[in-house]
Design a protein with these regions (language model features):
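Active-site cores that bind ATP or allylic diphosphates and position pyrophosphate for catalysis
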Residues: 5-148, 154-158, 179
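Catalytic adenosine-cofactor/nucleotide-binding cores of aminoacyl-tRNA synthetases and other
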Residues: 113, 125-226
Length: 226
C-alpha cells in the first residue's frame, strides 16, 4: 500500500529529473511500519497499491524488436490498484489475456515498459505468457506523436476528402515497411502479403500529402477502367 498523493509523486519525479536521475519510485511506502499504515488508513487516507518488482531481469523475443532485456531495477514498481480500489490496465489486461488464452499481443513500443511488468504478472499467476510485438509509433511529418484530439489524421477528415477506404487501409498496413504505396491491393492480397517481419523498428512518419496523392492516382485509374 502506498499513500503518496499525485502532487507528491510529481514533485519527486521533477526532483529526480532535475538531478539527472531516472524518475523511479523510491519505495518510501516499503519503509512504513504496520502501525503507521493502520494509522494512515484510520486518518482517512486511502492507499493505492503497487506491484513490487524483484531484481529479476525480464527478457523476451519481441516479434518486431527482437530480443529485449529489461532490468526491473530501471523502472518504477507499477501501480495496479488505484486508491478507489479500481484495478488498472497493467493487471486487468494480464488477467483478461490469461482467461481468454490470448496468444499474441501487438501494440505500440511505448508499452515496452508495461510488457516487462506484465510478464512478471503472468509468471505470478502461473499463466502462459503470450508472444509480444511492439510497433514503432507513427509520427507526423514534424516529428510529433499523433494525437486523438487532433482532427488532422481523423477518419472523419479523410472521408470528407473522399479518400478511398482501400487507399487508407493500404497506407496504414504498408507504412513502416518496404512495400510500395503505389500498388493498391485488395483485402485478400493485403491479408496474403502481411508479414510481421516487414515492419521497421524505427519510428515512421504519416504524411497526409501521400494519402492525397495516392488517392488521386487510384481514383483516376478507376475512372480509366470504367
Amino acid at each position: 500500500p502506498c499513500f503518496e498523493s499525485a502532487d507528491e509523486l510529481s514533485l519527486k519525479r521533477k526532483i529526480l529529473l532535475k538531478q539527472g536521475k531516472p524518475p523511479i519510485y523510491d519505495r518510501t511506502a516499503l519503509r512504513l511500519k504496520k502501525s503507521e499504515i493502520q494509522s494512515l488508513i484510520q486518518s482517512g487516507k486511502r492507499p493505492h497499491w503497487r506491484l513490487k518488482l524483484d531484481d529479476e531481469t525480464i527478457e523476451w523475443s519481441d516479434m518486431i524488436h527482437g530480443k529485449i532485456i529489461f532490468s526491473n531495477l530501471s523502472v518504477s514498481d507499477p501501480v495496479v490498484f488505484r486508491s478507489d480500489e479500481m484495478p488498472l490496465f497493467t493487471i486487468t489486461s494480464v488477467v483478461d489475456d490469461a482467461d481468454t488464452e490470448v496468444s499474441h499481443v501487438f501494440r505500440g513500443d511505448d508499452h515496452i515498459t508495461n510488457t516487462a511488468a506484465q510478464i512478471k504478472l503472468f509468471k505470478l499467476i502461473d499463466a502462459k505468457i503470450p508472444e509480444f510485438g511492439h510497433f514503432p509509433l507513427i509520427k507526423s511529418i514534424s516529428g510529433q506523436g499523433l494525437s486523438k484530439r487532433s482532427d488532422d489524421f481523423s477518419v472523419r477528415k479523410f472521408r470528407k476528402q473522399k479518400v478511398s477506404q482501400l487507399v487508407l487501409i493500404n497506407y496504414l498496413q504498408k507504412i513502416g515497411t518496404n512495400q510500395s504505396f503505389e500498388n493498391i491491393d485488395d483485402m485478400k492480397t493485403l491479408y496474403k502479403n502481411f508479414n510481421i517481419n516487414n515492419f521497421s523498428k524505427n519510428s515512421v512518419f504519416f504524411d497526409p500529402n501521400d494519402i492525397e496523392r495516392i488517392n488521386s492516382k487510384y481514383l483516376k485509374n478507376l475512372e480509366i477502367k470504367t
